[in-house]
Amino acid sequence: MIPLQHGLILAAILFVLGLTGLVIRRNLLFMLIGLEIMINASALAFVVAGSYWGQTDGQVMYILAISLAAAEASIGLALLLQLHRRRQNLNIDSVSEMRG
C-alpha cells in the first residue's frame, strides 16, 4: 500500500503541472489538457485519502470526477473544433479579439 504522503505529493505535483500548463500555454487545446490533468490529480487525491482511511467515498468521488472530466472534455473539444473551423487558429490571443 502506498503511504498517504506519497500519494498526496504525487497528486500535488500533477496538479501543479496541470496548473502550469493552463497558465503558461496560449493554445486552447493545451489549456484543456492542463485542466484535465488538474481534475485527474484531484481525483487521485480522493482515491489515496479514501484508501488510507478505508472509506469508499474516495472511489465514489473518483467516479464523479471522471464523469465530470469526460463531460468537460467532450464539450470543450466540440467548442475547440468549432473555433478551429471559424478561425483556423486555437491561440487564445486571436480568440479574445473583439469585433467592432
UniProtKB/Swiss-Prot annotation:
Residues 25-27, 81-100 are cytoplasmic. It comes from the Bacteria. The keyword Transmembrane helix applies. It is a multi-pass membrane protein. Its main location: membrane. Residues 1-3, 49-59 are periplasmic. GO terms for biological process: ATP synthesis coupled electron transport; respiratory electron transport chain. Keywords: Cell inner membrane, Cell membrane, Membrane, NAD, Quinone, Translocase, Transmembrane, Transmembrane helix, Transport, Ubiquinone. The keyword Manganese does not apply. NDH-1 is composed of 13 different subunits. Subunits NuoA, H, J, K, L, M, N constitute the membrane sector of the complex. NDH-1 shuttles electrons from NADH, via FMN and iron-sulfur (Fe-S) centers, to quinones in the respiratory chain. The immediate electron acceptor for the enzyme in this species is believed to be ubiquinone. Couples the redox reaction to proton translocation (for every two electrons transferred, four hydrogen ions are translocated across the cytoplasmic membrane), and thus conserves the redox energy in a proton gradient. There are 2 NADH dehydrogenases in E.coli, however only this complex is able to use dNADH (reduced nicotinamide hypoxanthine dinucleotide, deamino-NADH) and dNADH-DB (dimethoxy-5-methyl-6-decyl-1,4-benzoquinone) as substrates. Belongs to the complex I subunit 4L family. This is NADH-quinone oxidoreductase subunit K. It comes from Escherichia coli (strain K12). The lineage of its organism: Bacteria, Pseudomonadati, Pseudomonadota, Gammaproteobacteria, Enterobacterales.
